[in-house]
Amino acid sequence: MEEAKHNEAEEAQGIEAREAKQIEAGETSRSSRKLITFEPKLVINKGISVLGFVLRLFAVFGTIGSALAMGTTHESVVSLSQLVLLKVKYSDLPTLMFFVVANAISGGYLVLSLPVSIFHIFSTQAKTSRIILLVVDTVMLALVSSGASAATATVYLAHEGNTTANWPPICQQFDGFCERISGSLIGSFCAVILLMLIVINSAISLSRH
């Protein structure tokens, strides 16, 4: 009787051990499946964050470069017909001054946002800071777009003039000035495109949380 009880106890222990192993194996397989499905999502989130950082870095060069190019633009020429020295600089035109201010503000913000963007690369679960960046990114996009649009009208008048209003073009005399403000305008519109991509990138990143 004692041997039978002993055998039954051993069999019960064996059954419990097998059940424990099966449960452990099931949990291991479930955790491995979670790991397999989690890793691609983590890689994609990090990739989106890295792309956002790169876009911000290029946008910094676009905005600050445009502001510096426009803000240091001036030219002086001698009018042979009137024998006077003619001068022109960006501050003579309010739209160009607004252009410089808009790009400078946006460039300063983008520089300050770079550390936050780096933080998002290592902390893919951050949500509040992403919402703040998305809102401010949209405001900066509107600011730079308005500055570039306002400057475009002035640059066009400088090149083509307006015969109806009797405004002659000035680029025939101030060709260096016009070339520089035109180049600055191109850089600013490139920054507008980059800011649009940044907003889209931020929205996609936020939607994945």
Curated annotation (Swiss-Prot):
Membrane-side (Cytoplasmic) residue stretches: 1-49, 117-130, 205-209
InterPro entries named among the record's database cross-references: CASP/CASPL (IPR006459), CASP_dom (IPR006702), CASPL (IPR044173)
Membrane topology recorded in Swiss-Prot or TrEMBL: Multi-pass membrane protein
Region ranges (Disordered): 1-26
Entry keyword set: Cell membrane, Glycoprotein, Membrane, Transmembrane, Transmembrane helix
Disulfide bond sites: none
GO cellular component, one term: plasma membrane
Quaternary organization: Homodimer and heterodimers.
UniProt similarity note: Belongs to the Casparian strip membrane proteins (CASP) family.
Name of protein: CASP-like protein 1A1
Species annotation: Arabidopsis thaliana (Mouse-ear cress)
Lineage, broadest ranks: Eukaryota, Viridiplantae, Streptophyta, Embryophyta, Tracheophyta
